[in-house]
């Protein structure tokens, strides 16, 4: 058997679809005159490509509806985290298909390209042929990531070092987090590129981040004789794994009664949190790390305010790069996040506001600012709003909850879990409120 031949019993667990197998019409006839199956496949392909970008079910369904309406059909879709079942109807005929993805992720650059495609199709799609539509989608689908693994590692390093400062850490914690998160996310990206399973990627990345933090901290301590209390910053090194995107989109989907998608996204986020925190706890037990309070920093309230602005920007910018945002998009999200997250922290520190209420106002601010900015830059709302509030997701609280529960300190663990839950619930509520106020299409059902 030649090296080019593949045995009949070898195949991908999730088989790839050759979309051109469905094309039977010529490349001259407008797509609106193609048969039902050809048009329905276009609807499904757009939907599954949108879903692969990590966006919520409302946006996926809206895109499928635009394509269906442009091609003269009615579409009804049931959308989950990694699968779509949909039916297209036209002239007393119907075509039902089920499509699925092997995994899920976030790609804001591809999402932006698909949004532009949708606008073009809505305006002039009636004159396109089936072949032209597939060619445009092929071009979008074949687009590669904007950043190499080492770049994504640096983005996580920047984000987590800024994150740990916002949590109360100092220069030692920031330096060690930079190293730990950088190595951890680099390893995670390499494993993802090799199509490793979800649990393995999470476990190895978190363990690598914690161990890299410990090694760098021991080196700093040996060179500069710093306090052992700085070891508490190891939590910050693993915060790149926190699934802020599915957490927030879960709440958005539930608000639109897309129960399947909302619950699946919530379950996916909980799985990641559970595996990451348990692995972090196991590593901490093995190498004797403890999540103590950070050492107080000798900074005035004004200095905190002035430093929180650039730290929040760097954190959001780094997370946006991890979501494959281009530099301009990441900068836009970073500027919004700098204002929204600094406002949240100042409301807690100076206004003595409960953390949940401050999270709501911070997310509301981010949503309102994004609504203003997107009219000028044209980016999808979700690609700048969610990255701008991911930094507000209380990964530290979640880890401390699991750490204490693991030590059977149930009351302390429950306290941290309650604090985390309140913030996690209020973050999507803030975005939902902003969306209701600024988006007429979102405001109404149907």
Spans of features found by a protein language model:
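Alpha-helical transmembrane segments and immediately membrane-proximal extracytoplasmic
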Residues: 73, 89-111, 120-127, 142-153, ...
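Core alpha-helical transmembrane segments of integral membrane proteins
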Residues: 145-249, 323, 327
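Hydrophobic, membrane-inserted alpha-helices
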Residues: 155-163, 181-188, 208-209, 311-319, ...
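C-terminal transmembrane helix-loop-helix hairpin of multi-pass membrane proteins
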Residues: 233-238, 249-253, 257-272, 305-307, ...
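Soluble N-terminal domains of membrane-associated systems
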Residues: 1-134, 139
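Membrane-interface helix termini and inter-helical loops of multi-pass transporters
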Residues: 219-229, 287-301, 404-415
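Generic multipass alpha-helical transmembrane bundles of integral membrane proteins
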Residues: 240-248, 268-352
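Structural signature of hydrophobic alpha-helical transmembrane segments
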Residues: 164-180, 229-243, 295-311, 352-365, ...
């Amino acid at each position: 058997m030649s090296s080019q031949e593949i045995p009949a019993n070898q195949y991908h667990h999730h088989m790839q679809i050759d979309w051109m197998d469905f094309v039977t019409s010529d490349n001259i006839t407008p797509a609106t005159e193609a048969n039902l199956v050809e048009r329905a496949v276009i609807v499904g392909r757009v939907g599954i490509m949108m879903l692969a970008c990590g966006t919520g079910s409302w946006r996926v369904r809206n895109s499928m509806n635009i394509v269906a309406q442009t091609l003269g059909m009615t579409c009804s879709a049931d959308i989950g985290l990694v699968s779509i079942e949909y039916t297209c109807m036209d002239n007393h005929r119907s075509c039902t298909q089920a499509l699925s993805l092997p995994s899920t992720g976030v790609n804001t650059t591809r999402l932006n390209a698909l949004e532009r495609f949708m606008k073009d199709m809505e305006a002039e799609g009636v004159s396109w042929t089936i072949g032209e539509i597939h060619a445009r989608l092929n071009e979008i689908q074949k687009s590669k990531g904007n950043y190499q693994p080492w770049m994504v590692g640096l983005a996580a390093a920047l984000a987590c070092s800024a994150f740990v400062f916002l949590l109360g850490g100092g220069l030692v914690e920031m330096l060690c987090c930079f190293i730990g998160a950088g190595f951890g996310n680099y390893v995670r990206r390499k494993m993802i590129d090799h199509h490793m399973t979800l649990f393995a990627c999470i476990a190895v990345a978190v363990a690598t981040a914690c161990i890299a933090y410990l090694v760098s901290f021991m080196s700093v301590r040996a060179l500069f004789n710093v306090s052992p209390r700085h070891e508490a910053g190891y939590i910050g090194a693993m915060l790149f794994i926190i699934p802020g995107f599915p957490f927030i989109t879960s709440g958005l989907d539930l608000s639109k009664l897309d129960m399947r998608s909302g619950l699946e996204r919530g379950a996916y986020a909980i799985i990641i949190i559970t595996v990451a925190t348990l692995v972090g706890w196991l590593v901490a037990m093995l190498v004797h790390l403890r999540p103590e309070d950070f050492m107080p920093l000798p900074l005035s309230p004004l200095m905190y305010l002035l430093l929180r602005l650039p730290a929040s920007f760097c954190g959001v910018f780094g997370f946006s790069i991890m979501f494959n945002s281009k530099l301009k998009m990441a900068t836009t999200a970073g500027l919004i996040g700098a204002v929204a997250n600094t406002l949240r922290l100042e409301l807690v520190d100076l206004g003595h506001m409960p953390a949940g209420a401050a999270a709501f106002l911070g997310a509301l601010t981010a949503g309102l600012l994004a609504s203003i900015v997107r009219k000028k830059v044209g980016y999808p709302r979700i690609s700048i709003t969610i990255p701008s509030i991911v930094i507000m997701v209380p990964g530290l609280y979640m880890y401390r909850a699991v750490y204490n529960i693991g030590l059977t300190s149930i009351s302390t663990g429950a306290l941290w879990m309650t604090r985390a839950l309140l913030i996690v619930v209020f973050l999507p509520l803030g975005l939902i409120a902003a969306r209701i106020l600024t988006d007429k299409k979102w405001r109404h059902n149907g």
